[in-house]
């Protein structure tokens, strides 16, 4: 999670893979518990008593690798910035996601190839300008809100 926030893609990926290492709770042949845990066969994190921290933290880390968002208050106005693929590891150079949430009530669907965003849709619960960073560029875009007629998007 922290490595992803610091935009250290390979370190974040290494920790994520370590989280997914199979562990036997009994200390058997595949026991890795003393080397930093992993994941049990039931997909619980091997860090009792706080297994939920690892489960939710792992998901949050993946989300941070793909999308980071920030808000700042300027002149009584909240401004949002969304950064796409800020910590993308080499192992994930091609992929897609749907429904990743960002601050400000925004939702992101995107596809990427060779580490570059190729398709992007941003949906919003409210209208407004959002700064979006991707592929080495920064753009201010207008997002329309969800409505009864359909979802707002950029």
Residue positions per predicted region:
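Non-catalytic C-terminal accessory modules of carbohydrate-active enzymes
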Residues: 2-152
């Amino acid at each position: 999670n922290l490595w992803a926030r610091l935009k250290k893609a390979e370190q974040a990926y290494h920790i994520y893979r370590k989280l997914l290492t199979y562990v036997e709770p009994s200390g058997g042949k595949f026991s890795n518990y003393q080397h930093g845990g992993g994941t049990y066969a039931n997909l619980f994190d091997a860090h009792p008593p706080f297994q939920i921290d690892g489960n939710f933290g792992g998901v949050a880390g993946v989300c941070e690798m793909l999308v980071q968002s920030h808000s700042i208050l300027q002149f009584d106005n909240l401004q949002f910035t969304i950064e796409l693929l800020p910590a993308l590891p080499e192992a994930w150079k091609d992929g897609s996601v749907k429904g990743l949430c960002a601050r400000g009530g925004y939702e992101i669907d995107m596809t990427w190839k060779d580490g570059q965003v190729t398709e992007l849709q941003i949906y919003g619960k409210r209208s407004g300008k959002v700064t979006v960073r991707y592929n080495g560029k920064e753009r201010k875009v207008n997002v329309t809100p969800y409505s009864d007629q359909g979802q707002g998007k950029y």
